[in-house]
Amino acid sequence: MFLFTIENFHDRLKTERLYLSYRKLMYKEAFEIVQNRHCAEDAVSESFVRIIDNLHKIDEQDCLKTRSFLVIICQNVAKNMYNKKIYLNNQPDAYDDVLPEDVSESSDSLDILVKKETLSEIAGIIKNLDPIYRDVFLLKNVHGLSRAEIAAIFGISEEAVKKRLVRAKSKILKELEKRGELA
């Protein structure tokens, strides 16, 4: 299995503990997407191959953060497997609309908002984002992954990651404006 590819003994133990703790949850999440037992098992295995590459970013003590990180990776591996299975990976993205010019990935707007808004309000908005934006946003801003690392996890280009981050921030800002929270 994938554990034999890990040379460092402590990393191997950490991976094994993560696998034993989260495999059932990851399987459940993958199965909901692919609706096939074997594909769900493959998605969990493939997820751990990707997790091993980012093992240094996982803190076993922070269970909620670790859980969300592992679930996001597994869900996206399962989605990629599902899309490949039904040959949708060559279709143009339905969300590929024109980006607003006034929002950029490096915009400090959200940093300012964290000071103005309660975290629970922002968390509620993020939770309701389309998963394609939410997952990239969380991996970047909560888990601290680089665009390159996120691109590798999702099997997309860094430019696609950048677009999704910009769109996520734009959607968050629009929702806050809609709620009248922004001046």
Feature map (PLM): residue ranges:
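Structural recognition of an alpha-helix C-terminal capping motif at a helix-to-coil junction
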Residues: 28, 42-49, 64-76
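A short pre-motif secondary-structure segment
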Residues: 136-140
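N-terminal module of bacterial RNA polymerase sigma factors
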Residues: 1-25, 53-55, 110, 181-183
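Amphipathic, Lys/Arg- and hydrophobic-enriched alpha-helical face
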Residues: 19-38, 53-57, 126, 178
